[in-house]
Each structure stands twice: as C-alpha cells, then as structure tokens.
Amino acid sequence: MGWKYLLSDIEIAQQCKMKKITEIAASLDITPDELELYGSYKAKLADSLEKRLADKPNGKLILVTAINPTPAGEGKTTTTVGLGQAMPKIGKKAVIALREPSLGPVFGVKGGAAGGGYSQVVPMEDINLHFTGDFHAITSANNLLCAMIDNHIQQGNALDIDTRRIIFKRCLDMNDRALRNIIIGLGGQTNGVPREDHFMITVASEVMAILCLANDIDDLKERLGNVIFGYSRKGTPLYARDLKAVGAMAALLKDAIKPNLVQTLENTPCFIHGGPFANIAHGCNSVRATKLSLKMADYVITEAGFGSDLGAEKFFDIKCRYAGLTPNTVVLVATVRALKYNGGVKKEDTTIPNVAALKAGMVNLEAHIQNLQTFGVPVVVAINRFSTDTDEELAVLKEFCTAQGAEFAISEVFAKGGEGGVELAKKVVASCEKPQKFQCLYELNTPIKEKINALATRIYGADGVVYSPAADAAIKDIDALGRSNLPICMAKTQYSLSDDPNKLGRPKNFVINAATVRLCNGAGFIVVETGDIMTLPGLPAVPAACSIDVNNDGYISGLF
C-alpha cells in the first residue's frame, strides 16, 4: 500500500490543502450570515439555519459502530470519515457527523481522535485540542453548579442540603486519577464546609449529555433545571433550579449548543459536536448536529463510541428514541487483528497470519451482527484492512459474514482515502434501500431491573444481573421519584461483551455486576455502573502527552 504509511497522521493533515470553511458551507447552501466563523477553517452554525431548513426532507442515516476493540482501537472514526469521502466518488452527497475529541485520551492513549491516515477531519490539531471551546463551556457550566452548591452550604444552607448525599460531581477534560475522590473545604471556616467530593471527566458529565440531547436553548434550560444534584437531610431531591443556577449555566452554553462545521482531507463537510464517551456515558454526537445534517445531504454518516454493545445500543435506545430518528443502515467495523485478539492471540502477535485464531474470534463478530439485527436495521460489515491481512483470512471473513446475513466490504480508507471506500459506499447505498423495521430493545414503561436485564442477557449474553445493596437502594429511590420510565445507560468496559475486560470473544456463564445506579434526571436516563468502571480515567505509564510538542513556528507534532 506504499509510501503513504511513512507519514504520520499529523504530517498528512498538515500537508492537506484545506478549503475556506465558507466554501464548504456554500457546498451545503449555507449562507455567510448563517455562519459564525472561528478563523478560516472552523465555524459554528447559526440557529437561523435550523429554522430555515426545518421543512426539508431528511436524507438517509447511517450509523458506524464496531466489534469489541483492541486497546489500539479498530478505526471506526477513520472508516466513518473514509465512507463520507467515498460517497461523492459514486455521485452521492454526504455529510459526516462526529463527536468532538476529549483531551483525556488525546494526552493519554490515543494521541488524537480525528480519524487516521488519509481519512481525517481537519484542522486536526485544533479539533483534537481546544477546537471551538465547547468542552470548556460544558466544564464551566458543570463546575458553576458545583460552586453554587458549596456556596449555598457555606451561606447558611437554606435548602438543608445533606452533604453526604450530594451526587453531582465536579469535572475536567483530563485523565487525572488523583481527583477521583477528594476532600474539599479544608483550611478553616472561611474556606467552606469540609466534605468528600469527586471529579469525573467532562465527557461523562450530565451537562455534556444534556447539551447533546437538547433540541434548543429552551429544552437545554428545562433539562438543566431538572438536574438532581443531591438530597436534603429529610431525603427530598434537590434540583439545579432550586439554586437558581439554570440561567447562568445556559448562558455559558449558548454558543456551545451550536453545531461546529469543519471538513475532511478531501473537503467533505463534517459536523463535529458534543463528545460523550460510550463506555461511561451515552456515546453519541449531538441531536442538533445530526438532525441538521439530515436536512443537507442524501446520506449522513455518524458514529457511536466503542463497540455495538455500548455506543450503538445507546444510539438506538437513547438518542434515536428521544430524537425521533430512524437509522437506515449500520456499518459494523471489524479488523482481522481484533478478531484474532478475541480468539486468544496476544496483542503483539495479531499481525501474524493465523486463520484458526481468526475463526475462534469470529464469535465476537457474530454476537455484534446478531445484536444489531435485533434492532431491525440492515448490517454491512466493513473490514478495516491492514497490510498484514492475508487473502485467506479475508475470504474466511467474507464467507462468515454472508452466512450471517450481513453485507461485506473491505475498507482501505486509511491508506487510500475516499477511493479506498468506494466498495463500502456502494454496499451501504444499496443497504439503505433495504426494508428496515427499526425497534428499540425495550419499552420505557418496563421496570428498571427488567430493562437492565434485557441489556445484560440479550446484548451482552449474560445469565443475569447481580445488584449491590447501593444499586438496589438507588433503584428504589428512582422508583419512588416516579422516574423509572427512563432509558438505561450502561457504564461498562469496552473491551468485552461482559463487565470483565479480560473475558474476550463471546463470553458464556457470567453475570453483570451492577455496582452503582444513578439518575441523570436532566439528561433523561439512568446510569448503571458495572464492574470496576471509572468515570475519571488515569494516564498510562507513558502518556501520549510525552510525545507531543510545538515548535517556534507553531507547528504541533506528536498527535497521531
């Protein structure tokens, strides 16, 4: 596949000839007064655009998801971008809708999250770092509420807040394990009331979820007001609106709620907006960006985080349910190396040809195909090809996918850009014409434990669910509040269908361990934290940050 592999992602991105964002906007019939420019290559979209396009018909909605990944990831965003670049090559107008990267994994493991090779969104450095400031605004709004909680306690505590039952956490957009559990208010009376507190990463914040699910400012304010931040000493739930925090929080978010427009290396328009993780949050870009993109293109390609057991399930059961969206096709990204890994091969040996291990690991692919078919949407399996994949291995995969009732395409968009995704694009377009009977996994009025059990048994393959005393108590509290009719957002490891990252393939004879359950009343879902999941990750032994630098001319290196 040639010399192109010698260039890093950031080198490829820096050599790209970007068009001015006004040109990209013009290709979508967006007028200059409907753009809010952030330099020459980034823009936010004005609210007036949404109103102008309200009556236009929607294009086709394509979701890109994946099997359970190796720690390196399997190229889901790369495939999403590459497919978007391939669509114009077969005469189709396409828009891509992605999440914004978090600084946590950028400086932790990934080193960047804007696609890879010749299928990237640009300006890559800006997107991976501060971008248009959305995450800063979300972090600020979240922490404003936290500051107002502790200030209220300090100023006399008229709401009788029980400091042992404050459930709303501070956040920051960084991997920093030292802040998971802290004591605040030390240093005497003038420095606040001492209590235990916690940080989570911004992408797991309820404010992030609210921004991504809100339709407009009024909806945003209503959801912010419904946030339950804690309980009084009598056990009464306390809301953000009780602190009169909603107006100021919404003011901080007034620009962040507007979708961002950028482009790919091949100038395909891309909306990047919102960024909840799929393992500890609902894992989808904003409803506003998705709905807006559907008014502008024949095909909208979006992605949901990690494997289909996490991101895709939440896309269907949370995002599509709330937004009234109907997906036309799902692209399931898999790699030969990940299937070998799921077949028991060590990570460092996955590039060695091994058909037996591939076949052993295909049970994981089988589970994901069957899970997606449960939702009634046609499936196209996209094999993200690596140079070490053999023809024999690819032939085995094609035969297997066909037997499962799924379409199959080889994707080479990393090395070839849109040209490497033409086969996939043709399969996806044809798949979008197939009849689909989209349905969610469960009805909202089903009891909480039955909804959790449906996810555990039908999607993960578990025998059942074991609840901690704390989880049981939380479910009773949610029932008592009359909020049991909300969708479930499972917080679970991305590396396994189970809640144990070491159980690869298609595990059998296991249970899901529900450690904690919490109500995200403003976002409108119930989070179930399983296993040892952390809502504030830590950095690895050698963080990606160690390789990132900037020279005197402002050129950044080390983002990959």
UniProtKB/Swiss-Prot annotation:
<dbReference type="InterPro" id="IPR000559">
    <property type="entry name" value="Formate_THF_ligase"/>
</dbReference>
<dbReference type="GO" id="GO:0005524">
    <property type="term" value="F:ATP binding"/>
</dbReference>
<dbReference type="GO" id="GO:0035999">
    <property type="term" value="P:tetrahydrofolate interconversion"/>
</dbReference>
<dbReference type="InterPro" id="IPR020628">
    <property type="entry name" value="Formate_THF_ligase_CS"/>
</dbReference>
<comment type="similarity">
    <text>Belongs to the formate--tetrahydrofolate ligase family.</text>
</comment>
<dbReference type="Pfam" id="PF01268">
    <property type="entry name" value="FTHFS"/>
</dbReference>
<keyword id="KW-0554">One-carbon metabolism</keyword>
<keyword id="KW-0436">Ligase</keyword>
<feature type="binding site">
    <location>
        <begin position="70"/>
        <end position="77"/>
    </location>
    <ligand>
        <name>ATP</name>
    </ligand>
</feature>
<keyword id="KW-0067">ATP-binding</keyword>
<comment type="pathway">
    <text>One-carbon metabolism; tetrahydrofolate interconversion.</text>
</comment>
<keyword id="KW-0547">Nucleotide-binding</keyword>
<dbReference type="GO" id="GO:0004329">
    <property type="term" value="F:formate-tetrahydrofolate ligase activity"/>
</dbReference>
<dbReference type="InterPro" id="IPR027417">
    <property type="entry name" value="P-loop_NTPase"/>
</dbReference>
<protein>
    <recommendedName>
        <fullName>Formate--tetrahydrofolate ligase</fullName>
        <ecNumber>6.3.4.3</ecNumber>
    </recommendedName>
</protein>
